[in-house]
Amino acid sequence: KLRSKIEIKDLSSSHAVGVISKDKFEEIQEELGSKEKTVLYRESPCFVDTRLSSLGARILSSLEKLHLTIKKLNLKIIDKSNYLKLSHKEGIPIEGVMSLQNSLFGLESNFEELKAIDFKKGCYVGQENTARMKLKNKLRRRLLPVTSNKPLNISDEIKFNDQVVGKVLIGGQYPFALI
């Protein structure tokens, strides 16, 4: 419903979000006897990553119950770089995305592939431009993960046969470029 009154609370000081594998989420579903994509496990919402199932699921837990949730689910805490490497391989930028705000169209950011844009329903910011780009097949650039044998920084040019074909928009260990 448009213009519904909602309240958004910052729970970051009392809750944590964890990433779990798709297999672990399916175990939780089986334990609960549910096939829903969002389930409640011991008062903790757990939901599939709607962008790509290979990115697993999220579980939201209060900090008070976090240790117990980790223990009950037999989870292992792993280094964040494992998840960042997977998301980079899948073409999903995680870090550095705030610098992209207001600089790309949704289609350039792969929103259609990530199911963030549905051309059968409407009403979102930039709908007219996005629909026109889709209709006229005018998508010329796309945000893609890139790799290099040397470090890539924001604004570095991507060249092919000595011609500039793109520009790095997210630098660091897991860079993305608009190509």
Predicted regions mapped to residue ranges:
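Glycine-rich, small/acidic residue-mixed loop/short-helix segments
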Residues: 107-117, 127, 131-179
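Acidic, low-complexity central loop/insert segments
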Residues: 1-90, 159-160
